[in-house]
Amino acid sequence: MKAFTQHNGLVAPLDRANVDTDQIIPKQFLKSIKRTGFGPNLFDEWRYLDVGQPYQDNSKRPLNKDFVLNAERYQGASVLLARENFGCGSSREHAPWALEEYGFRSIIAPSYADIFFNNSFKNGLLPIILSDAEVDELFQQVEATPGYQLRIDLQAQTVTRPDGKVLKFEIDAFRKHCLLNGLDDIGLTLQDGDAIAAFEAKHRASQPWLFRDA
């Protein structure tokens, strides 16, 4: 998993509340068990005017020019600004996969659905919670300022606006440690690789009859 320490990124404003996981990545794209290939279909039903299908050539599909991610000024955005209860709906982990593969490193919103919130941390995506008032002000500034960027510092737990104002956010210490060091569940397990190998060797030596055919 890619570590997250500091990030300067262009902000895209998704001014909708209760964005669910089926809107983030529609159900027809969930057939793959790989963690890649979902970025091109992020917000598929909003980005395109037709109904998307797996393995389709998106370059030939009609774009919804009114959708924020299709606007020229938000191309290359890596910070998504959203409203309350982002990521609600079914518990598909494909949602943070799609957001991360598209290029987003962080989401800023007043609240998230619990399962999406947890899955984001496990996939290198930083979901930041700010107050409604702080989010409202960010929406106003982003929409009024082309090229609006934020500086996110995970170690300091701060979001710095272009005008210099610093917004503080809270994060669980364990999740912060994992993101700073790029540790997902597999990475955490591998940290104990020597201890696991020692246990297996001891177990094999003490009960060799269990491993005669191994």
UniProtKB/Swiss-Prot annotation:
Report the coiled-coil segments: none
Q: Which reaction does it catalyse?
A: (2R,3S)-3-isopropylmalate = (2S)-2-isopropylmalate
Q: In which pathway does it act?
A: Amino-acid biosynthesis; L-leucine biosynthesis; L-leucine from 3-methyl-2-oxobutanoate: step 2/4
Please give the function described in this protein's UniProt entry.
Catalyzes the isomerization between 2-isopropylmalate and 3-isopropylmalate, via the formation of 2-isopropylmaleate.
Family as reported in the entry's similarity comment: Belongs to the LeuD family. LeuD type 1 subfamily.
User: Assembly and interactions?
Assistant: Heterodimer of LeuC and LeuD.
Q: What is this protein called?
A: 3-isopropylmalate dehydratase small subunit
The record lists the organism as Pseudomonas fluorescens (strain ATCC BAA-477 / NRRL B-23932 / Pf-5)
